[in-house]
Regions:
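Outer-membrane beta-barrel translocator domains and adjoining extracellular loop/strand segments
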Residues: 39-46, 99-108, 126-128, 134-144, ...
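Outer-membrane beta-barrel initiation region
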Residues: 15-88
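Outer-membrane beta-barrel "beta-signal"
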Residues: 327-346
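Residues on the lipid-exposed face of transmembrane beta-strands in outer-membrane beta-barrel proteins
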Residues: 27, 31-33, 68-78, 111-117, ...
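Detector for outer-membrane/organellar transmembrane beta-barrel domains
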Residues: 161-181, 192-273
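Transmembrane beta-strands of outer-membrane beta-barrel pores
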Residues: 31-37, 76-78, 93-99, 127-135, ...
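Repeated loop/turn-to-beta-strand initiation elements of outer-membrane beta-barrel proteins
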Residues: 79-87, 118-125, 166-174, 206-213, ...
Length: 346
């Protein structure tokens, strides 16, 4: 972080602070209206169990939910002496509310500062926060094997990213991030520090669109393993590998100005090999997300987008009952509206 700040200050040295502050701020207000058909990511077996024991659903009566999300973002561009060099500061905050699930109400946001020195040349630092994200009700084995308790976690992530061109309209992007994922008091045995690295190659085709291929590798260290209560005697560390393939077509189709799809496949392998923990021992899963989207500018400053996501997780385990318990299907669909504004006090 200190190194990044030194770089930014060095390029601002030749400008007065009044010149530095003269650029306008672009604000965007967003509203999302969506539907989730399996909020708690329940397997078929768990849905059958929930019909007899609704405490699994955390007090609600449905598997699905309508949700709304409000967002506010701001972008400030600072042009430096060299026309190809600039600094961008971007911040965004989201407030989400699942109507049928009172526990799934949370806020998230992030701040990015980036230095650009030409086409596809960028150095960026990001700080992200996800606050009190509700997963579902689980058993707290340190207290009771019969009662369920609300389980939520909070993410704090820092990421350093750099991109550079390879040749005309072809560029590479790499990043490294550090995420602290800490759970509420009843489930601290799952607290983890996660290191993730990514490498993405992107190609933009003239009068067509953009396609990318990204590889992601992460290691989650269960920092509370062996510390504290009995439940921490089991190691919940894991490794995961992802492949991500997004494609966008910007020449218009089906009434949209741009359409696209993305395919993301995640492979996760738990570290634990302990017969006393059949739920995690030797367990791995393959999760696939397939998105289809389209967007259209209704007015110069008003944009609407539509997205549908199909999600599937297949779990592999030494135990058939674990495979069935931890596999699920899910469908998301949402419509977003964004209204852009320009604030220029000068």
């Amino acid at each position: 972080m200190r190194f990044f700040a030194i770089i930014l200050l060095s390029f601002l040295w030749g400008q007065t602070w009044t010149d530095y502050l003269r650029s306008p701020v672009k604000w965007t207000v967003g509203f999302t209206n969506g539907y989730d058909n399996n909020v708690l990511r329940l397997s078929a077996i768990e849905k059958d169990d929930a019909a007899l024991n609704q405490t699994i659903l955390g007090g609600t009566k449905t598997f699905d939910s309508h949700y709304v999300r409000f967002s506010l973002s701001g972008l400030k561009k600072i042009q430096l002496g060299d026309r190809e060099k600039k600094i961008q500061i971007f911040a965004k905050s989201n407030l989400s509310n699942y109507i049928q699930y009172k526990h799934r109400q949370y806020w998230s946001g992030y701040v990015k500062a980036s230095y650009h020195w030409g086409a596809y040349r960028r150095l960026e630092y990001m700080l992200r926060h996800l606050d009190n994200y509700y997963m579902r009700h689980y058993k707290d084995l340190d207290i009771s094997v019969n009662h369920l308790f609300s389980c939520s976690f909070t993410d704090r992530e820092q990421r350093l990213l750099i991109s550079h061109p390879i040749k005309l309209r072809l560029w590479v992007t790499g990043s490294i991030s550090y995420t602290q994922r800490y759970y509420d008091r009843s489930f601290t045995e799952f607290d983890s520090d996660i290191i993730t690295t990514t490498l993405k190659v992107s190609k933009k085709f003239s009068d067509f669109g953009t396609i990318s291929l990204e590889g992601i590798y992460g290691i989650a260290d269960n920092i509370t393993f062996g510390k504290g209560a009995k439940s921490s005697d089991l190691d919940r560390s894991y490794r995961h590998t992802e492949l991500y393939l997004p494609f966008s077509y910007d020449q218009g189709m089906l009434g949209f100005e741009a359409v696209g799809f993305s395919l993301r496949t995640d492979f996760r392998q738990y570290e634990v090999e302990d017969i006393s923990d059949p739920l995690h021992s030797g367990r791995s899963h393959r999760e696939t997300k397939f998105d289809i989207w389209g967007k259209k500018n209704v007015k110069k400053n008003l944009m609407i987008s539509c997205t549908i996501r199909f999600r599937n997780r297949f779990t592999d385990s030494h135990y058939d009952w674990v495979s069935e318990l931890k596999s699920f299907n899910q469908i998301h669909a949402w419509i977003s509206i964004e209204w852009k504004m320009l604030y220029d006090r000068y």
